Regions:
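A compositional/biophysical signature of low hydrophobicity enriched in polar/charged and small residues
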Residues: 1-138
């Protein structure tokens, strides 16, 4: 069962993916063994999918776009599989609200708009709503 300690562990990891189990134990005043056991449980239950970084693409001469996608319901499953197969799509989310999916697209500055346009070529994608990231605030 997911509890307060699990939430605190996840919050610490979210803020600093490099934090050690020792540091987590110290900050939460729990044993290292408890931290290790909780992390194993959170991974086994699929709550923690992986550990990753948040890159500042602009500092590397790259561009990042957050793209809202309007996808026809009858094509949704295949369209999202096709979109997820692109190596320049870093993340893809099924969402509710104004869009049916959100894609995080990363490419060099010269081709980012072409990559966004390529999403419109996927069968079932009716429209794209790109927002180009200027800077990471948090």
């Amino acid at each position: 069962m997911f509890n307060k300690i699990d939430k605190e562990i996840i919050n610490l990891l979210y803020c600093n993916g490099e934090i050690s189990s020792d540091e987590i134990a110290s900050k939460l005043d729990i044993s290292k063994g408890t931290v290790r056991n909780r992390l194993i449980k959170l991974k086994d239950e699929g709550i923690i999918k992986n550990y990753s970084i948040r890159a500042r693409w602009q500092k590397m001469g790259m561009a990042e776009a957050i793209v809202g996608l309007e996808i026809a319901p009858e094509n949704y499953i295949q369209a999202t599989k096709d979109i997820a197969s692109y190596d320049w799509v870093n993340e893809l989310y099924r969402v509710s609200g104004d869009h049916s999916a959100i894609a995080i697209v990363v490419s060099d500055n010269d081709t980012i708009q072409d990559k966004v346009a390529d999403l419109l070529k996927v069968k079932g994608v009716k429209n794209v709503y790109p927002s180009f990231v200027q800077d990471l605030i948090k």
